[in-house]
Amino acid sequence: MPSIKVRENEPFDIALRRFRRICDRAGVITDVRKKEFFEKPTWVSKRMKAAAVKRTHKEMAKNRVYRKRMY
């Protein structure tokens, strides 16, 4: 769990902002949301495969060359 030391004469909202930033960088929120509900291993593999397919389609679309007709 990330922690911060509140500096002397530091306002609470600035300390809270620093704490949130550290939590975001550590990935605490995403990890908690991911582990909120149980996910079957088959669902995990299915989701990962779908993400891989989406990535490849996105990369192929980015590299696709469109021919321009010259008439």
Swiss-Prot record:
Question: Which InterPro entries does this UniProt record tie to the protein?
Answer: Ribosomal_bS21, Ribosomal_bS21_sf
Question: Which biological process annotations from GO are given for this protein?
Answer: translation
**Keyword Lipid biosynthesis found:** no
Q: What is a single cellular component term in the Gene Ontology annotation?
A: ribosome
- Provide the transmembrane region boundaries: none
Q: What are the GO MF terms of this UniProt record?
A: structural constituent of ribosome
Source organism superkingdom: Bacteria
Gene3D superfamilies from the entry? Ribosomal protein S8 (1.20.5.1150)
What's in the keyword line of the UniProt record? Ribonucleoprotein, Ribosomal protein
Read off the Pfam families from this record: Ribosomal_S21
- List the NCBIfam families hit by this protein, alphabetically: S21p
HAMAP family registered for this protein in UniProt: Ribosomal_bS21
What family, per the record?
Belongs to the bacterial ribosomal protein bS21 family.
Name this polypeptide is given: Small ribosomal subunit protein bS21
The organism is Vesicomyosocius okutanii subsp. Calyptogena okutanii (strain HA)
The UniProt gene name for this protein comes to rpsU
